[in-house]
UniProtKB/Swiss-Prot annotation:
Predominant localisation class: secreted
Phosphoprotein in keyword set: yes
Keywords: Adaptive immunity, Amyloid, Amyloidosis, Blood coagulation, Calcium, Coiled coil, Disease variant, Disulfide bond, Glycoprotein, Hemostasis, Hydroxylation, Immunity, Innate immunity, Isopeptide bond, Metal-binding, Phosphoprotein, Secreted, Signal
Modification sites for 4-hydroxyproline: 565
Gene name for this UniProt entry: FGA
Boundaries of every Fibrinogen C-terminal domain copy: 623-864
Originating species: Homo sapiens (Human)
Name under which the protein is recorded: Fibrinogen alpha chain
Cross-linked residues, Isoglutamyl lysine isopeptide (Lys-Gln) (interchain with Q-?): 527, 558, 575, 581, 599
Modified-residue entries (Phosphothreonine), positions: 412, 505
Lineage: Eukaryota, Metazoa, Chordata, Craniata, Vertebrata
């Protein structure tokens, strides 16, 4: 076996050597040596080597690149390009997402801006309307102030003329007395004090010399003008608007406002800042945010020195202007928590009266009425106070007979920034007015009594501590504590009240109107003056609080009374005469059913009737109550909110009851009191006599509802003569009215109806009645009131039972506003059960007897302004 291997090896070596040494043979010569396709054997390791060198041109013939190398290069480049493309795609998706979010956010912002611009535009328009309305009201107030100033100047001239006449009269009397001394057995020793007249004239001239009119710089109010800005975008930027997105173009559609402040009488125009804020942009001037306004009225009253700034009340101060009556002697009530220069309390400027040297509370329509005296500013001839809540009258006049205490302390009032407003007031009461039962003459102070009657003098003083606490909810609690000294031992040096130095002294002259006939009796004898206090004193009450102010209906009910800080109230019970027998604190003044008492006391008049007055603690708390309003015309003239229609409290003449009525102040001249209304048929008007006597139904604050006021009230309201207004409306919306002079009799007279002097568009159905049936049978004039349980008509049967409601029936009707309410208008009487008759809400001369009206109203107002 081994030998065979050796043999094979030898043969192989020999063959190889033979082949290598042999030359070209015939095979190669015949072309057998041509290179042809060969079977390529793949090596497993060929493509595993990734580090192949590049093929150059020189190497291409004998060393070419392999397909594996080419594939590797292609894959590498492809992967690189794929990565780049994916990166670009991711960036594109992220940009699209951000762009979408940005667009959504921009759209939301634009919607918010549109809403804000629209709200700002509405606020600008509202501000423009309110400012114009405020300016017009201020102009009206300025005109009223000028009228009052002119009235004051006229009264001052009259006072001066009367003073001259009185001086001349006293000189004439002195001449006559001197002339009869030679012929008379006994003459009166009398001296004429002309120096006192000269002093009074000088003081009066000083008062007249004061300029009450507003200063020239305040005669013309600035005018605020608001107008839209025409070109919001400057011209050089308009071309760029074409390139902006549509949502941004929407900003140019929002109108912007420009505010300008023009001062009449000058060329100065004050504009606000130049910045606009889209719709309703307003340009404002810098202002003090803590001040609610400023009104420097200058010298606004006789004897007033310095400026009062009631609008700028400072920290914790509030200022409220509540207009009052437009009638004579009443311009409203201004209560300022920060009273201004020279004042330490509330100032209630109103209507100064002739002879007064301060400022009076409004609501004083009577000549010579003193009203509510709270002046503490510098006043020529008088710097005292008169607080009606305590009733203390503290004169400080240099006139004869008056002396100021050595330690005057008329009270202090402090407003703090918190909710607690402490105040302390000391009051000193001096000698009192005392009269004896046998002498009808009232004397004051230490004046000698010429008759045989006895006069006593008493002194008392009191110290009042008032603390006002305002809670976080706005509730205001007033606590008062008064310490009274009956013997006057704790008083400082007291002053004489109204002491007269002799006949002809004019000490009380400034507190009374010279035109009154009882003027001379008042000056010489000291008698109380009826009507000295305004019947409308309590109608103007302003509650000044640190958080605001509010007003209400300032009338007392029968069972309980509404107390208002700073304003005293009359007790509603007790009737007293004008001559008081005994006093324990100060003077009483009476007018009709109303009594003003400065302190709590028991008072007996000459007839022996007594009226008890209430107080707090051991104090003698003052109560003052004005005459309540009688009707809606009175409300219109005196109530702070009387110019607006609504529900008000009134007190009927001749009655002690106070009740609520609805006043229509918008129709015609205003002052209409609603006495009957039908609107929807929700209330049955087929009622008893007692129901119609007392009234029934109800109204809401807007005057909607069905009701009948009551025949008793109609009688009391129409005793002095009234105007009846009947308003009718059919189902098509057509309206008509009828007006009559109107009066309703008493219950003893059957509440008889008296009408005359028809005017209107509805036709005269109450006097002329129905033309077809004749006025004799259908006129309602002079007819008594009838109900189904009390028949007073002219028909043999009961008209009220048949026609469905109480009315002033004849035989039977041409008008019946209390009939059965049929919706729709025209109705067929044959369908009515149980009586087939025209018993709807009818006014024959307007729509016929077979047409039931949709709405009817009956209103009354005084025939003449009372």
């Amino acid at each position: 076996m081994f030998s065979m291997r050796i043999v094979c090896l030898v043969l192989s070596v020999v063959g190889t050597a033979w082949t290598a040494d042999s030359g070209e043979g015939d095979f190669l010569a015949e072309g057998g040596g041509v290179r042809g396709p060969r079977v390529v054997e793949r090596h497993q390791s060929a493509c595993k080597d990734s580090d192949w060198p590049f093929c150059s041109d020189e190497d291409w013939n004998y060393k070419c690149p392999s397909g594996c190398r080419m594939k590797g290069l292609i894959d590498e480049v492809n992967q690189d390009f794929t990565n780049r493309i994916n990166k670009l795609k991711n960036s594109l998706f992220e940009y699209q997402k951000n762009n979408k979010d940005s667009h959504s956010l921009t759209t939301n912002i634009m919607e918010i801006l549109r809403g804000d611009f629209s709200s700002a535009n509405n606020r600008d328009n509202t501000y423009n309307r309110v400012s114009e309305d405020l300016r017009s009201r201020i102009e009206v107030l300025k005109r009223k102030v000028i009228e009052k100033v002119q009235h004051i100047q006229l009264l001052q001239k009259n006072v001066r003329a009367q003073l001259v006449d009185m001086k001349r009269l006293e000189v004439d009397i002195d001449i006559k007395i001197r002339s009869c001394r030679g012929s008379c057995s006994r003459a009166l020793a009398r001296e004429v004090d002309l120096k006192d007249y000269e002093d009074q004239q000088k003081q009066l001239e000083q008062v007249i010399a004061k300029d009450l009119l507003p200063s020239r710089d305040r005669q013309h109010l600035p005018l605020i003008k608001m107008k839209p800005v025409p070109d919001l975008v400057p011209g050089n930027f308009k071309s760029q608007l074409q390139k902006v997105p549509p949502e941004w173009k929407a900003l140019t559609d929002m109108p912007q406002m420009r505010m300008e402040l023009e001062r009449p009488g000058g060329n100065e125009i004050t504009r606000g800042g130049s910045t606009s804020y889209g719709t309703g942009s307003e340009t404002e001037s810098p202002r003090n945010p803590s001040s609610a306004g400023s009104w420097n009225s200058g010298s606004s009253g006789p004897g007033s020195t310095g400026n009062r700034n009631p609008g700028s009340s400072g920290t914790g101060g509030t200022a409220t202007w509540k207009p009052g009556s437009s009638g004579p002697g009443s311009t409203g009530s201004w209560n300022s928590g920060s009273s201004g220069t020279g004042s330490t309390g509330n100032q209630n400027p109103g209507s100064p009266r002739p002879g007064s040297t301060g400022t009076w509370n409004p609501g004083s329509s009577e000549r010579g009425s003193a009203g509510h005296w709270t002046s503490e500013s510098s006043v020529s001839g008088s710097t005292g106070q008169w607080h009606s809540e305590s009733g203390s009258f503290r004169p400080d006049s240099p006139g004869s007979g008056n002396a100021r205490p050595n330690n005057p302390d008329w009270g202090t009032f402090e407003e703090v920034s918190g909710n607690v407003s402490p105040g302390t007031r000391r009051e000193y009461h001096t000698e009192k007015l005392v009269t004896s039962k046998g002498d009808k003459e009232l004397r004051t102070g230490k004046e000698k009594v010429t008759s045989g009657s006895t006069t006593t003098t008493r002194r008392s003083c009191s110290k009042t501590v008032t603390k006002t606490v305002i809670g976080p909810d706005g509730h205001k609690e007033v606590t008062k504590e008064v310490v009274t000294s009956e013997d006057g031992s704790d008083c400082p040096e007291a002053m004489d009240l109204g002491t007269l130095s002799g006949i002809g002294t004019l000490d009380g002259f400034r507190h009374r109107h010279p035109d009154e006939a009882a003027f001379f009796d008042t000056a010489s004898t000291g008698k109380t003056f009826p009507g000295f206090f305004s019947p409308m004193l309590g109608e103007f009450v302003s509650e000044t609080e640190s958080r605001g102010s509010e007003s209400g209906i300032f009338t007392n009910t029968k069972e309980s009374s509404s107390h208002h800080p700073g304003i005293a109230e009359f007790p509603s019970r007790g009737k007293s005469s004008s001559y008081s027998k005994q006093f324990t604190s100060s003077t009483s003044y009476n007018r009709g059913d109303s009594t003003f008492e400065s302190k709590s006391y028991k008072m007996a008049d000459e007839a022996g009737s007594e009226a008890d007055h209430e107080g707090t603690h051991s104090t003698k708390r003052g109560h003052a109550k004005s005459r309540p309003v009688r009707d809606c015309d009175d409300v219109l003239q005196t109530h702070p909110s009387g110019t607006q229609s609504g529900i008000f409290n009134i007190k009927l003449p001749g009655s002690s009851k106070i009740f609520s009525v609805y006043c229509d102040q918008e129709t015609s001249l205003g002052g209409w009191l609603l006495i009957q209304q039908r609107m929807d048929g929700s209330l049955n008007f087929n009622r008893t006599w007692q129901d119609y006597k007392r009234g029934f139904g109800s109204l809401n604050d807007e005057g909607e509802g069905e009701f009948w006021l009551g025949n008793d009230y109609l009688h009391l309201l129409t005793q002095r003569g009234s105007v009846l207004r009947v308003e009718l409306e059919d189902w098509a919306g057509n309206e008509a009215y009828a007006e009559y002079h109107f009066r309703v009799g008493s219950e003893a007279e059957g509440y008889a109806l008296q009408v005359s002097s028809y005017e209107g568009t509805a036709g005269d159905a109450l006097i002329e009645g129905s033309v077809e049936e004749g006025a004799e049978y259908t006129s309602h004039n002079n007819m008594q009131f009838s109900t189904f349980d009390r028949d007073a008509d002219q028909w043999e049967e009961n008209c009220a039972e048949v026609y469905g409601g109480g009315w002033w029936y004849n035989n039977c009707q041409a008008a019946n506003l209390n009939g059965i309410y049929y919706p729709g208008g025209s109705y067929d009487p044959r369908n009515n059960s149980p009586y087939e008759i025209e018993n709807g809400v009818v006014w024959v001369s307007f729509r016929g007897a077979d047409y039931s009206l949709r709405a009817v109203r009956m209103k009354i107002r005084p025939l003449v302004t009372q």
